[in-house]
Swiss-Prot record:
The keyword Nucleotidyltransferase is annotated on this UniProt entry: yes
Reactions performed catalytically: RNA(n) + a ribonucleoside 5'-triphosphate = RNA(n+1) + diphosphate
PANTHER family with a match to the protein in the record: DNA-DIRECTED RNA POLYMERASE I SUBUNIT 2
UniProtKB keywords: DNA-directed RNA polymerase, Nucleotidyltransferase, Transcription, Transferase
Organism lineage string: Bacteria, Pseudomonadati, Pseudomonadota, Gammaproteobacteria, Alteromonadales
Pfam families, A to Z: RNA_pol_Rpb2_1, RNA_pol_Rpb2_2, RNA_pol_Rpb2_3, RNA_pol_Rpb2_45, RNA_pol_Rpb2_6, RNA_pol_Rpb2_7
Record-level GO BP terms: DNA-templated transcription
E.C. no: 2.7.7.6
GO annotation, cellular component aspect: DNA-directed RNA polymerase complex
Protein name: DNA-directed RNA polymerase subunit beta
NCBIfam families: PRK00405.1, rpoB
Amino acid sequence: MVYSYSEKKRIRKDFGKRQKVLDIPYLLSIQLDSFKKFTDQDPTGERGFEAAFRSVFPIKSFSGNSELQYVSYKLGEPVFDVKECQIRGITYSAPLRVKLRMVLYDREAAPGTVKDIKEQEVYMGDIPLMTDNGTFVINGTERVIVSQLHRSPGVFFDHDRGKTHSSGKVLYNARIIPYRGSWLDFEFDPKDALFVRIDRRRKLAASIILRALDYSTQDILDLFFDRVNFKIKQDSLVMDLVADRLRGETASYDIKDAEGTVLVEKGRRITARHIRQLEKTNTTELEVPVEYIAGKISGQDYIDPDTGEVLVSANAEIGLEDLAKLSLAGIKEVSTLYINELDNGAYISDTLRIDSTTNRLEALVEIYRMMRPGEPPTKDAAEALFNNLFFSEERYDLSKVGRMKFNRRLSIDDDEGTGILSKEDIVAVMKNIIAIRNGLDEVDDIDHLGNRRIRSVGEMAENQFRVGLVRVERAVRERLSLGDLNELMPQDLINAKPISAAVKEFFGSSQLSQFMDQNNPLSEVTHKRRISALGPGGLTRERAGFEVRDVHPTHYGRLCPIETPEGPNIGLINSLSTFARTNNYGFLETPYRKVIDGVVTDEVDYLSAIEEGRYVIAQAIVELDENNRMMDELIACRHKGDSTFMGAADIQYMDVSPQQIISVAASLIPFLEHDDANRALMGANMQRQAVPTLKADKPLVGTGIERTLAVDSGVVVAAKRGGYVDYVDASRIVVKVDEAELTPGEAGIDIYNLTKYTRSNQNTCINQRPCCSVGDPVVRGDVLADGPSTDLGDLALGQNMRIAFMPWNGYNFEDSILISERVAQEDRFTTIHIQELSCIARDTKLGSEEITADIPNVGESALSKLDESGIVYIGAEVKGGDILVGKVTPKGETQLTPEEKLLRAIFGEKASDVKDSSLRVPNSVKGTIIDVQVFTRDGVDKDKRAVEIEEMHIAQAKKDLTEEFQILEDGVLGRARNLLLGAGFDEAQLDAIPRSQLLMQTIDDEAKQTELEQLAEQAEELKADFDKKFEVKRRKITQGDDLAPGVLKIVKVYLAVKRTIQPGDKMAGRHGNKGVISKICPVEDMPYDEKGNPVDIVLNPLGVPSRMNIGQVLEVHMGAAAKGIGNRITEMLEEQRELAELRGYIKEVYELGDEVQQRVDIDSFTDDEVLRLAKNLKGGVPTATPAFDGAKEKEIKQMLALAGLPTSGQLTLCDGRTGNEFERQVTVGYMYMLKLNHLVDDKMHARSTGSYSLVTQQPLGGKAQFGGQRFGEMEVWALEAYGAAYTLQEMLTVKSDDVNGRTQMYKNIVDGNHQMQPGMPESFNVLLKEIRSLGINIELDQK
């Protein structure tokens, strides 16, 4: 494999054995592609804005004299960029402008004669835009729209699993689900009649809907039944014989062939052998006794030719008397419905008998009454309602997906079709459910991923936009019918508010629009790849059963079987598998390699769950020879959802990679194959909660996906084009682009500005640091700067810690963790958290609130950290209770006593008419102010601090743009200089020419002169561009802010808090091995090895066997080897050994392993590259053991041997306190530990006195309210059982809701008198009031 310059800085040793056929696709494509389809112009009009506009327009007036037509749309440019929107707290969006055409028709002339046409561009609201990383900025916060897994439109057949009826009889049902519109259900009742429901309302006989579709009783019978024809003879009947129909019946008479030979005796069951005999003798007619027809059902009306009287009506039972009547009337032939118990039930016939309607109108009225109970039906209303239900394109849409699923399920060849239902569709569904009831077809599996599809952000936004458009449509139609249209323009007809409101509601408050989980890069990526079955149109937690939540065979390679939340949402929220993607219909598909005659090709096909069922698919772990031919005779494979063994020749596809079944988070767990799934689930979920540490540390034992994830998450800065690094500082990287990648006429400079110390959604710190040096060559995709939780482009969520598995004085009881003081001293798990605190000055009824340093009754020391505007300085160290922003609020006027009036006259007005409402630091918070932002309403005077901040921002913007301009100008001048050097000028001449004159030189060579003139033009453009950019920036900074109504000023203060690790913090490994720190132990007391090196963390060995996550033990062994090799390399460097020896050792490390795919050609590295690689490997050789394809025990032992460590992975340790050796050897190695975002500082809380609930007078609950601990029912029982009467009295009175008692208690404590006088708790008064509210008077007699 060829490595770039930056990749050679540190290479991860990969133990993967399988050939990589397919790179992991871009991880955020599900979000970006979906939204791109929504916003991109689509000439076909099948999706996005175009589809929404075409579905609603043209809007015609009620009279038909005018209409509003849609022409085209344009999405403008956003006013503010993403960062500005986040700072200002506004939505990152772009204006949507639509060109509409208003057409007026001439009433007097022929229909369709145009009188006037007006075209105009109309503003239709702002549409939130997606950022490059797949998020939306709504009101200043980053949000993610989670994709939804919902039931695909189409037709589904199911049954109730015998739960509806007490007999346990299975009742079948069918449901037609459209994309928009009414649901249509068909269902059997226990008596086997077929019923229909519309939108889950009251059920009607299914034949009613057929009558409403204009089918008569005769038509219905013809549609659903075959006929049996009888010829009437003197004393018998002759039946037309279809031999197959007799199978399974019991002969009620002797069955004879044409010659009179008895084939089946009376009373015998007719078998397949008898049928074959009948067919052999070509028997087409059979003489049967007259009694045979009794009870059979007539297939048509029989009318007396003379009188016109109906002798036997269709669907009526024929008796012997009826037969006599027919014979008398001269009717020679009778046809009955072919019905048998086995596979041809009389379901529709029974249904027709229940049905009280006889014609179309009655059926329509019946449907109208069911849909609109209480309204008097009219013919037109009933007809309109029925048509609008399923046959109107405005109200009903199956969608392309729905039509495709519908047609495939009912075996209709064409996948295309209309979005509305037809008569034939409804009949086909009824025929199919009857076939299922007859045992001729199967019900569907609704949890199959072929029946569930993904609705992504673009589709949901389009639906919401359409909802807004429909609201506008109603208003437009009314306006077109009223008023003088000659004077109106399209602008006057359209009100953009309903559209904006619908879109805003979706992005702001939909259940699927979620506050982005921004703990670390992994949590961001996972959130964007999440698939939820909840949300509008989906399931609810309470209703979802076990089947929906369970892992289904079709999840393979599509949804991760491991990563899902624990708790009520388990199985309802899933994660997309690593290689999965959605197809055009929204179904999930996964890639497979094609196999032809046992030979695996490199051709990759993406298959959906439906397609996959048709093929035989082998796993990725199949052994292949050098020609990619399968070596085993029998191969484990999957077919139609079952696992089986088949020969190599039968295999049609093979998995692309062993990791394709799991999600990104699960594939970050090394040795995943050795962990129990429950613990792996916890491991995958806890990695998302890891807080970025101060100094990121790459995992020594990884899986090889770390770099892909870090780059795709967007937290690192990756090179857009190749070149070399020209300039680096903490906030900017400049890359000079290679000539080969330049587009003609550009400066050839790429500038990357880095994000510095900004706050994430979870209050963690986002900071980017350059990881390249000036002069480094870069290629496209190389990592130039690390973000949070990344180290040299690798995802680094935690720290590599030296672990020992042993008990230590009970401090690791029940998963507790003992850590060394050294870990805290070295700041290994120190994290920075940034809090945003806001102070809002409002306009109140009594006057405006004011931000000022002049605060009543506050001492000088409390104001020491504020400037003259009353806002805290940047860099100030603050603690709980300190004032950050001084604010005073006007107080209501009260009647003053003469004494107060005198005091006011002496000391001035100020003190009494305002109260202090300053922003203070929350209790138990201590940190440093790192930034202050002031937002002032338009028209309100800016204070001194606001002006200073503004000037600072302008100066910073000017500096940035000037530097950017100079870099680009230097690039242009550098190319001009090279051009002049090639045209006869020498260095000395060029040095003498001033910079400004360099581009004005003349050259004899015409081509070069033209090029020089082009460069001069370019320099001019750059200057003009710089001036324009600066003016835009300046205007944005100085303009007033658009604040909420009534808000005059907002001050945002950013506080950085440094959190070191301490007892009570939660830590975890990657295998679900979590615990809480019990003690930070001095280094000298920690167990140490024979060389005197102490361990960092002691874990309880009992945490491994019962939890079955053995992966952690293998990780510790591999980590020990990786670190040991790093120590050997460090020794070589310190002893300044020969470079050849170092190169040889490193080569030996990378070549270890028999079937390993990775090949690192260390011989091709230069001496400098080898030295740089060795320096980066001093901390340990990072290794990769991919899931299901990782390092074997033998390879771990080889690595340990190479590191000079015992191959058992165990060492003899000594007790740090006594110096004595422990009895047995201990497993010691390196494990990657994470510090989770459950910090003791956020949870620890104590209360003495504080606020009380107004009604109950009991202390509030929770840390946020500075509340107390609940002393509940069971705790009272405990004190009662113990007999601690006085403690109990104290708990129930002065410590709870005895108002007078607690006031007295406070005074007593102040006076040093430690006694209490309990009174009556307030809860008695509450009880009194509750009883009185029931109308019962109850009073307390106080004696």
